[in-house]
A protein has these predicted regions:
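C-terminal helix/juxtamembrane-tail motif
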Residues: 213-230
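GST-like fold's C-terminal all-alpha helical module
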Residues: 100-200
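Phosphate-coordinating loops and pocket residues in cytosolic domains that bind phosphorylated ligands
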Residues: 51, 200, 209
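GST-like domain detector, emphasizing the conserved glutathione-binding G-site
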Residues: 1-145, 225, 230
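Charged, solvent-exposed alpha-helical segments that act as regulatory interaction surfaces
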Residues: 84-87, 168-172, 204
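Acidic carboxylate-rich catalytic motifs and surrounding loops in phosphoryl-/glycosyl-chemistry enzymes
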Residues: 39-40, 205-215
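Long, amphipathic alpha-helical surface segments
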Residues: 197-205, 219
Length: 230
């Protein structure tokens, strides 16, 4: 059984930028993997961490002599544990995976601004709406690249978590978007279908988090930022 140690920035940040690694490890497609998760506060990393990982980046994977940073690099590395023919990357190819990572990045920045800051603007809301529209047009269906689950799905889907909360933030920034969450979300019908499908994947169900949990985490982060600014 392979052993690996994964260092992640924060328990809840795994839901945002490293949940894809958790889902990959528990996908059932790979052989059983044991791994230790060490959760770090990105604003107060312990002194030993830079000695282990000079870049001090998260997420970070330590496996035997391998030290890897960046979620895309870690995902591709872990994906090969069962062999190239069985890899999820082979289902989408490098091009499809890069496309998914680029879309995920385009969602991540405005999503973060809307959720975790008090200075989000209508421009941030528009950027997220444009990113979701691009995703809606790109999904081949039923999965991101077609008929089978691929590494591309695990790259993009974590950024569609806490959906109703994020849609609510959009409404706050742009009241012309619709009267309620359902109205604004209806702009992206393929994304909605995709979310329903992916939410039923065993690896997602096993690692899913409740919307209330995410909201509490957002409140904690916003309150800490406000306190630090005093």
């Amino acid at each position: 059984m392979k052993m690996c140690r994964m260092l992640l920035a924060n328990a809840k940040l795994t839901n945002v930028d490293a949940k894809n690694i958790d889902w990959l490890i528990t996908s059932g497609i790979l052989p059983p993997l044991r791994y230790d998760r060490i959760l770090l506060d990105p604003s107060a990393k312990p002194g030993w961490y830079p000695r282990l990982n000079p870049s001090a980046q998260v997420p970070f994977l330590l496996y035997r002599t391998e030290k890897l940073s960046d979620s895309d690099v870690i995902m591709k590395y872990v994906d090969l544990f069962k062999g190239e023919e069985a890899s999820l990357l082979s289902k989408c190819g490098e091009e499809g995976f890069k496309m998914a990572m680029d879309l995920a990045s385009s969602i991540a920045t405005p999503r973060y601004k809307l959720c975790f800051t008090k200075d989000a603007t209508k421009e941030d809301a528009d950027a997220l709406k444009n990113a979701l529209s691009n995703l809606d047009q790109t999904i081949k269906g039923p999965y991101f690249m077609g008929e089978t689950l691929s590494l591309a799905d695990l790259a993009v889907f974590p950024f569609l978590n806490a959906w109703e909360f994020v849609m609510g933030r959009l409404l706050q920034m742009d009241d012309a978007s619709g009267d309620n969450v359902d109205a604004i979300a209806s702009q992206w019908p393929r994304v909605l279908e995709y979310r329903q499908l992916m939410s039923k994947e065993p690896c997602v169900e096993q690692n899913a988090f409740q919307e209330e949990e995410f909201i509490k985490f957002v409140d904690d982060i916003v309150n800490k930022k406000a306190a630090a600014a005093l």
